[in-house]
Amino acid sequence: MLSWAVTFLVVALIAAVLGFGGIAGTAIEIAKIIFFVAIVLFVISAVAGLMRRGRAS
């Protein structure tokens, strides 16, 4: 799950670079949405991983 969050974060950053660089004007809003979704998924994955690691010990 953490790998999916990191993947979405990378995709969002690439879309942001392309959008803010003027290549695709509409990609700016899409990049913002994907970026925040990726951040939320990353936080959820990190918390779930910490909880899982805590139970395994």
From Swiss-Prot:
Bilayer topology term: Multi-pass membrane protein
Subcellular localization: Cell membrane
Primary site of residence: membrane
Signal peptide region: none
Pfam families attached to this UniProt entry: DUF1328 (PF07043)
Keyword field: Cell membrane, Membrane, Transmembrane, Transmembrane helix
Cellular component, GO, one term: plasma membrane
TM segment ranges: 4-24, 30-50
Family: Belongs to the UPF0391 family.
Descriptive protein name: UPF0391 membrane protein Xaut_1725
Organism from which the protein derives: Xanthobacter autotrophicus (strain ATCC BAA-1158 / Py2)
